[in-house]
């Protein structure tokens, strides 16, 4: 169904649940409670997930251990989530928490030491496989923000293991403030660099389940969405677009209505939400430019989108991947036909909405 606030906000956001049938612009909108999204988790089950995964029985025929990969930028709540999950005992076996920081501390005496990451992750991979083969569920704790970093370990996981991903999410400013409060801080610049490299995890990588965890965080989801839209209500300042960013997103979403499933329509309406954060009048060489550039906006937009609504693993992946036909054809060409068709629909609407 279309957002009932569409006449006022003109966005046309497609809603899948009645409690979300609002957007902005109505004095007294239909809304759920002022949301405190504390210890909240959600996940989606898109089409043909099973066709990309295989789960078998463990060697003893009784229990299938889990490989649970945490994904997130610094300050997003990975450590908190790891501690929570590590307290469990499954089928009489403890859950093993394997952390890249802990391994750095063990071999170098300093968890912040970035020396020889290859050695660190080689040890991490070996310990992970050994624990899984012993029947333990493993919490794999590192940033894991790129497909390459995830693939290196996913390709080694035994077939009998269930592969799960938990995206630990918080708004960017919250991650920065949490980092500042730590004794061992990475700094805002490092967080920014990681954010711009972020590639949303998805089922084509081999995951059986992807969960988004928003833990210990209080924020109002509707206001968060309004703020995202307000931020992109600015000029593109770029000859490739005649419409402002918000208007471009609106046109993209409208073009998809009736032409694509609702979740792709939704992605069209917000696919460029990362542009407000990334807008710069410097080119890729750092030189002053007369036009605006939006390097890595798809990465930032994907991260921002996790706070919008309850089926964001797919929404985030679509935003993260919508530029792939331009900037990452190798990945685009590797996608299953169904997933590629989703990107094609979004990419076509994006190009036509100027």
Predicted regions and their residues:
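Cysteine-centered metal-binding/redox modules
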Residues: 1-58
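Conserved GTP-binding G-domain of TRAFAC-class P-loop NTPases and closely related GTPase folds
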Residues: 67, 71, 173-222
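Divalent metal-dependent catalytic cores for phosphoryl transfer on phosphate-bearing substrates
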Residues: 255-354
